[in-house]
Swiss-Prot record:
Keyword match Nucleotide-binding: no
The name this protein goes by in its record: 4-amino-5-hydroxymethyl-2-methylpyrimidine phosphate synthase THI5
Cofactor(s), by name: Fe cation
Subunit structure: Homodimer.
Result when mutating residue 12 to A: Unable to sustain growth in thiamine-free medium
UniProt-reported outcome of changing residue 195 to A: Attenuates the coordination of ion and is unable to sustain growth in thiamine-free medium
Origin species: Saccharomyces cerevisiae (strain ATCC 204508 / S288c)
Cited Gene3D superfamilies: Periplasmic binding protein-like II
Recorded catalytic activity of this chain's protein: N(6)-(pyridoxal phosphate)-L-lysyl-[4-amino-5-hydroxymethyl-2-methylpyrimidine phosphate synthase] + L-histidyl-[4-amino-5-hydroxymethyl-2-methylpyrimidine phosphate synthase] + 2 Fe(3+) + 4 H2O = L-lysyl-[4-amino-5-hydroxymethyl-2-methylpyrimidine phosphate synthase] + (2S)-2-amino-5-hydroxy-4-oxopentanoyl-[4-amino-5-hydroxymethyl-2-methylpyrimidine phosphate synthase] + 4-amino-2-methyl-5-(phosphooxymethyl)pyrimidine + 3-oxopropanoate + 2 Fe(2+) + 2 H(+)
């Protein structure tokens, strides 16, 4: 049975959007496929692509921009599927901090970022808006961006809408302030990207492992698809099962984050070709990818039909923003139905 083992590294400690992975384990979906899974948590999220690329771990999770950069830096990894599609990502701040929708209001402020690519993104934006990197103070926060904003260690920081923004909203609610006082300058809008796909969370593989174990990867993805279908069909029941296994997530904050992640879960798991093209171009613009870089993703290990891509991605993003705001106000589980 040792040959059926897969080591899988999360992109951080267990979060609400890791639910398909853990339910595939607890509900026996991996076992049905003859797989013995070892699900690991990183000490440092910045090490994930290096550990997978060096072959110390077989598979794991990472955002699209990091997956692209990893291979460019000599860590051979490939995305084989999507977990969380295009979560809104941007510079988070609180109303009353002196920051406005004008990017130049960040001048003289302390801005937090998760890892080095966040710093590169902000530096590129400062040039675009007539500023210099010296016009702000960069603070590396890891995954503690919301915490640092709350504690006053930074004025703003890069985060995603369904995670760090919800954390800020919960803090505001406890202070008797409206949740809408948590604001975001979306990077896709600031950088004229047309999508938030650079932070799409992906299932990635070590290239050598993928080459030697194609059937094992197919089986893994079948189990993940079954778990994802289960989550999307009955999110409340799925959550109860998840927190029974991960009781540290049994709190209001995690549940609200889960509600906001719900619309972002990829139902098909397919890598979106248009998104990869855009983010590869963005990576070249940021100079983290060489001009001749070829995107490192594949859909060949997914054994069900590929859905059509949305015809108008900008309209889809606009509708998603409205949808997520409604979800925040109503606290419900809803998927966005896009017009044909």
């Amino acid at each position: 049975m040792s040959t059926d083992k897969i080591t899988f590294l999360l992109n951080w400690q267990p979060t609400p959007y890791h639910i398909p992975i853990f339910l595939a384990q607890t509900k026996g979906y991996f076992k049905e496929q003859g797989l013995d899974m070892a699900i690991l948590e990183p000490t440092n999220p910045s090490d994930v692509t290096e550990l997978i690329g060096s072959g110390k771990v077989d598979m794991g999770l990472k955002a699209m921009i990091h997956t692209l950069a990893a291979k460019a830096r000599g860590f051979p990894v490939t995305s084989v599927a999507s977990l969380l599609d295009e979560p809104f990502t941007g510079v988070l701040y609180l109303k009353g901090s002196g920051i406005t929708e004008d990017f130049q209001s960040l001048k003289g402020k302390k801005i937090g970022y998760v890892g080095e690519f966040g710093k590169i993104q902000i530096d590129e934006l400062t040039k675009h808006y007539g500023m210099k990197p010296e016009d702000y103070t960069a603070v590396r926060c890891g995954m503690n961006v919301a915490k640092y904003i709350i504690e006053g260690k930074i004025d703003a920081g890069i985060g995603i809408e369904c995670m760090q923004q919800v954390e800020l909203e919960e803090y505001l609610a406890k202070q008797g302030r409206p949740a809408s006082d948590a604001k975001m300058l979306r990077i896709d809008k600031l950088a004229c990207l047309g999508c938030c796909c650079f932070c799409t969370v992906l299932y990635i593989c070590n290239d050598e492992f993928l080459k030697k174990n194609p059937e094992k990867v197919r089986k893994f993805l079948k189990a993940i698809k079954k778990a994802t279908d289960y989550v999307l069909a009955d999110p409340v029941k799925a959550w109860k099962e998840y927190i029974d296994f991960k009781p540290q997530l049994n709190n209001d904050l995690s549940y609200k984050q889960y509600q906001r992640c719900y619309a972002y879960f990829s139902s098909s798991l397919y890598n979106v070709h248009r998104d990869w093209k855009k983010v590869t171009g963005y990576g070249k613009r940021l100079a983290i990818l060489p001009p001749d870089y070829v995107s490192n993703y594949t859909n060949e290990y997914l054994s069900w039909p590929e859905p059509e891509e949305v015809s108008d991605p900008l309209e889809a993003q606009r509708l998603m923003a409205i949808h997520q705001e409604k979800c925040r106000q109503e606290g419900t589980f809803k998927r966005l139905a896009l017009p044909a």
